[in-house]
From Swiss-Prot:
Major subcellular site: cytoplasm
The entry's keywords: Cytoplasm, Methyltransferase, RNA-binding, rRNA processing, S-adenosyl-L-methionine, Transferase
Gene: rsmF
Cell compartments where the protein resides: Cytoplasm
Protein name: Ribosomal RNA small subunit methyltransferase F
Gene3D superfamilies noted in UniProt: 3.10.450.720, Vaccinia Virus protein VP39
Active site: 244 (nucleophile)
Free-text function comment from the UniProt entry: Specifically methylates the cytosine at position 1407 (m5C1407) of 16S rRNA.
EC number: 2.1.1.178
Length: 486
């Protein structure tokens, strides 16, 4: 049962537009959220995914502001997060409202992102980060930052699962970006830490202990963050500021603070025409203030601005950092690595990015990262491709999953796919010539690596990716599987 603090209701009533009803707001807060997903177009087309899952009984209702987003209806026995398709990274379970900020940043499809350098200032768990990576088609550079140590691991796991390869991960208080990467980014998403007032439909206790006195402390951090973002933004660049909270002080007032600080250099962009019906949530400034009852979603706030003029630095330029541990790969190793990936997996490494080496490790960096090297410390850049062995290479799961052509995998059926994801070997029905490292796939999408030994496929799935619980995405198959268990 949802817990709405009466003090919260009294406070938020001051910010609610006159055309909205408090009774309706309270009613919608008590309703469970409709499950929603975003198809990962880095791994499958939206049309192919819909066709594939319609055959399994899934029903889809389009999210108006995201071409790849859908509210879904599935059988109660289907656990979305435990399906093979979810583990493969074919879709992300993402609340519909949280698909809005990336759409606001890029209202039109990006035709060519190779020259773009983006920053996602508060990335975890990765829904918007991976949405941006898909919109960029893994081109250009996306710097994904997360301050919380406990959430960095979750961010990396989701980035890896979704096959995003154009990322560089950082782990900082995002207030440093304006100083260390001054006017370095073409576009920035700041999904700011907030009071979370819009999440009560997902977390019934989110507002149980709501305290108005905490808002100013949160808003103070948000003001610092939006200033840092603005300083890190190139002149002419776009900044989207968003929260999952509802009060004005964490939303409109933070944006107006930036305007008051930097004046005519800040130009607000209206989002009233972002999608059909967006005007229902539009404010006088052109921001979107999404109350739960407007679109039957979580509460959210989204603002977009353009930096129309350069601004002065507010601190000295930091000294360049030294001792970067990576060097460009030598010519001989480069040729051997490229030949191996081409022969084994059909992956053409040339033209994909910058090939780098650290000791016996080989990495693929996004092309645009070089100007940022030495200005800030990265936790991880791009993809680790392989480790060098005495003879040959040991390929990395995440690299092959992100780069390999969909048609290259050894096809498995659903039962075999589930066995594989549980860490088990796959027996072959007839003995064949051993083929070494290979990919296995299910429904045309990759599952991971195996070693083809002739009589079986030896599982090479990293141990941290092995799952104990996996369910079928088909209600009928789930029932059959359950019947077979004792």
């Amino acid at each position: 049962m949802v817990q709405l603090n009466q003090n919260f209701i009294n406070s938020i009533a001051k910010d609610m537009p006159d055309h909205l009803s408090m009774d309706e707001f309270i009613s919608y807060c008590a309703k469970p959220l409709r499950p929603s997903i975003r198809v990962n177009t880095l791994k499958i087309t939206t049309a192919d995914f819909i066709t594939m899952m319609n055959a399994k009984g899934w029903q889809f209702e389009p999210v108006p502001w995201c071409e790849d987003g859908f509210w879904v209806k599935v059988d109660d026995s289907v656990q979305l997060g435990n399906t093979v398709e979810h583990i493969q990274g074919l879709f992300y379970i993402q609340e519909a409202s949280s698909m809005l900020p990336p759409k606001a940043l890029f209202p039109e499809p990006i035709e060519d992102a190779t020259s773009l350098t983006l920053l996602d200032m508060a990335s975890a768990p990765g829904s918007k980060t991976t949405q941006l990576a898909a919109m960029m088609n893994n081109q250009g550079l996306l710097v994904a930052n997360e301050y919380s140590s406990s959430r960095v691991k979750v961010l990396h796991a989701n980035v890896q699962r979704m096959g995003a390869s154009n990322l560089a991960l950082t782990h900082f208080d995002a207030r440093v970006f304006g100083k260390y990467l001054f006017e370095s980014f073409d576009a920035i998403l700041l999904d700011a830490p907030c009071g979370g007032e819009g999440t009560v439909r997902k977390d019934p206790d989110a507002l149980k202990h709501w305290d108005e006195s905490e808002i100013e402390a949160i808003a103070s951090v948000q003001r610092d963050l939006i200033e840092s973002a603005f300083l890190a933004l190139k002149p002419g660049g776009s900044l989207v500021y968003s929260t999952c909270t509802l009060n004005r002080r964490e939303n409109q007032d933070v944006c107006l603070h930036l305007k008051a600080t930097y004046g005519d250099a800040v130009q607000f962009e209206s989002l009233a025409g972002l999608f059909p019906g967006a005007e229902k949530a539009s404010t006088s400034e052109g921001f979107l203030h999404v109350w739960p009852q407007i679109f039957d979603s979580e509460g959210f706030f989204i603002a977009k601005l353009t930096k129309i003029a350069a601004v002065p630095r507010n601190s000295e330029e930091p000294r360049k950092q030294k001792n970067f541990p990576f060097t460009p790969i030598d010519k001989k190793s480069r040729q051997a690595l490229c030949d191996y990936f081409d022969t084994s997996f059909g992956i053409k490494l040339d033209g994909q990015g910058i090939l780098m080496q650290r000791d016996d490790e080989f990495w693929l960096f996004p092309t645009n990262v070089d100007p940022l090297i030495g200005k800030i410390r990265f936790q991880r850049i791009g993809l680790k491709l392989a480790d060098a062995l005495k003879k040959g290479f040991k390929p990395r799961h995440e690299a092959v999953m992100a780069l390999a052509d969909r048609l290259r995998g050894i096809p498995l059926d659903e039962a075999q796919a589930i066995q594989y994801l549980m860490g088990r070997d796959i027996a072959l029905t007839s003995k064949e010539k051993p083929q070494g490292e290979r990919l296995v796939s299910y429904q045309g999408a990759h599952l991971g690596l195996v070693k083809h030994l002739g009589n079986k496929l030896k599982n090479s799935l990293p141990r941290d990716l092995v799952r104990d619980k996996i369910c079928s995405s088909s209600a009928m198959a789930v029932d059959q599987q359950a019947t077979g268990e004792d």
